[in-house]
Amino acid sequence: MSAIYNFCAGPAMLPAAVMKKAQQELLDWNGQGVSVMEISHRSKEFIALTEQAESDLRELMQIPANYHVLFMHGGGRGQFSAVVNNFLGEQGKALYLVSGQWSSAALAEAQKLAGEAQIDSLNIVEKHNGLNAVVLPDLHKIDADYRYVHYCPNETVDGIEIFDELDSPWPIVADLSSTIMSREIDVSRYGLIYAGAQKNIGPSGLSIVIVRDDMLKLPSLPQSSIMDYRLAVEHDSMFNTPPTFAWYLAAEVFAWLKSTGGISSIAKINQQKAQMLYQCIDGNAFYRNGVVAANRSQMNVTFQLVNEALDGEFLKQAQIAGLVALKGHRIVGGMRASLYNAMPLDGIVALVKFMNEFAAKHS
């Protein structure tokens, strides 16, 4: 069978080695004679798995000791509401930086739940010569007492990524769903990091939360117990039955990433993959990208065919060539190639070859 390269934005492809291992031990995990999907989440064997998963993630991301690592339900959208309910209180204030679709969605959820609390927002994307560009504000010049400032460093729909570290006088809450472990960051700069698992961690249904200890002292709002960070910490992410199979696969992905050299190693590969694809787009008048070079996403490369009438044929021929899930988000259209950690360099080589051949044929 010819290789299939899955460019889906999420749920995304998983490392081939992880998938093969999961396949091999699906019916008999760890010598238990049953699947990991069937074993008790409170068994000593599964507890050992969760402890190893947290240890590996802490090592990979260099997470300081004063941070808790939580494995929770609900994905990224679940965390939109959890952040508000856990930190805002009845009279709190929060600032949301808007750079695209997902930060806009987080803002909308905060506004819906805030009640008497105050939610402010700043649009940080401007047009520079017709291209989208991020302009980070000087937050130290804002006279306000915010509980936190929320932002999304990578917008998967818009193909926008913020590489500069945010400098804030208030705790930073970051949605890292699409960039977690794709490049190195300084975790100590953040009050809370959350990430839906279905891009760089594992299957959908799981979210990772990395929260600094002092954030748990902020006033909270009434909320569902399963989204209460304090309860999650108290019960080691097992206040209720967790998504065990997703947790198992996340543990395997962490182990795989360590075996490949860790985040510093994968970051170099990710940069190389993105550069190859953007060079193809920029070097051919057949394609275009709408983001300034400094803010082009390494994880989600968006592009359009200058002749949009060829979109359908492009996707059809790409599918035949084994290049799947290249259709852009329904909101913005065009094309999108998601280059998460599991996407091998060979996938980009194949995509660039196809794009060049398609352009030559239809120019």
From Swiss-Prot:
Cellular component per GO, a single term: cytoplasm
Modified residues (N6-(pyridoxal phosphate)lysine): K199
Domain of life per record: Bacteria
The reaction(s) this protein catalyses: O-phospho-L-serine + 2-oxoglutarate = 3-phosphooxypyruvate + L-glutamate; 4-(phosphooxy)-L-threonine + 2-oxoglutarate = (R)-3-hydroxy-2-oxo-4-phosphooxybutanoate + L-glutamate
Compartment(s) where it occurs, according to its Swiss-Prot or TrEMBL record: Cytoplasm
Keyword Transferase: yes
A Pfam family of this chain: Aminotran_5
Recorded GO MF terms: O-phospho-L-serine:2-oxoglutarate aminotransferase activity; pyridoxal phosphate binding
EC top class named in words: transferase
Keyword entries, A-Z: Amino-acid biosynthesis, Aminotransferase, Cytoplasm, Pyridoxal phosphate, Pyridoxine biosynthesis, Serine biosynthesis, Transferase
Cofactor: pyridoxal 5'-phosphate
GO term, biological process aspect, one: L-serine biosynthetic process
Pathway(s) the chain acts in: Amino-acid biosynthesis; L-serine biosynthesis; L-serine from 3-phospho-D-glycerate: step 2/3; Cofactor biosynthesis; pyridoxine 5'-phosphate biosynthesis; pyridoxine 5'-phosphate from D-erythrose 4-phosphate: step 3/5
Main location (coarse class): cytoplasm
Annotated pyridoxal 5'-phosphate binding sites: G76, R77, W102, T156, D175, Q198, N240, T241
Stored InterPro entries: Aminotrans_V_dom, Aminotrans_V_PyrdxlP_BS, Pser_aminoTfrase, PyrdxlP-dep_Trfase, PyrdxlP-dep_Trfase_major, PyrdxlP-dep_Trfase_small
UniProt KW Zinc keyword: no
EC assignment: 2.6.1.52
Residues involved in L-glutamate binding: R42
Cofactor: how bound: Binds 1 pyridoxal phosphate per subunit.
Role summary: Catalyzes the reversible conversion of 3-phosphohydroxypyruvate to phosphoserine and of 3-hydroxy-2-oxo-4-phosphonooxybutanoate to phosphohydroxythreonine.
Similarity remark: Belongs to the class-V pyridoxal-phosphate-dependent aminotransferase family. SerC subfamily.
Record's subunit section: Homodimer.
Name of the protein this chain belongs to: Phosphoserine aminotransferase
The species this protein was found in: Shewanella baltica (strain OS195)
Lineage: Bacteria, Pseudomonadati, Pseudomonadota, Gammaproteobacteria, Alteromonadales
